[in-house]
Amino acid sequence: ASDVYKRQLLCCFENNILIEIPFFAELNFLKQALFELQKQSYSPVLAHPERYVSLSGETEIKDLKLRGAKLQLNALSLIGYYGKDVKKKANEWLKKGFYDFIGTDAHNEYHLSELQKLRLGKKELKEWMNIKISQQRLIGL
């Protein structure tokens, strides 16, 4: 195993660990990373999967979910901040209930101001609220 997997990592709430991979990484790289982290009793949460090139369809997402991966939606993806294709994937995957967490990925005030453009349909809003409730339970709110 790589030295990265041997180091102690900072986790919160049920050994969840947020991971990010290069946007053009091969799917096998991601699967191996998930496997190595799970061997160490971590519960990987993949940040903004809608932005990864190798995760282009539902088949890949369903496979990752079956492998125990959790997914974190980047809220900026829903407004088209990263392009139309990413927005389309994010909205479809939100409607289908693939996400376990929602994050802003806001690194500055501009990102936060962009989030004010967010508008959700009924189905997306329902899934958003389900995720929010699950997150609150997880952290004890």
Name these PLM-found stretches.
Residues 8-10:
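Short secondary-structure boundary/capping segments
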Residues 1-5:
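Short, small-residue-biased leader/transition segments that mark boundaries at the very start
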Residues 99-114:
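Short acidic/histidine-rich active-site segments
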Residues 116-141:
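Mid-to-C-terminal alpha-helical segments outside catalytic/metal-binding sites
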Residues 58-59, 114-116:
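Short amphipathic alpha-helical segments
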Residues 12, 16-96:
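Domain-core and long-helix interface of multi-subunit machines
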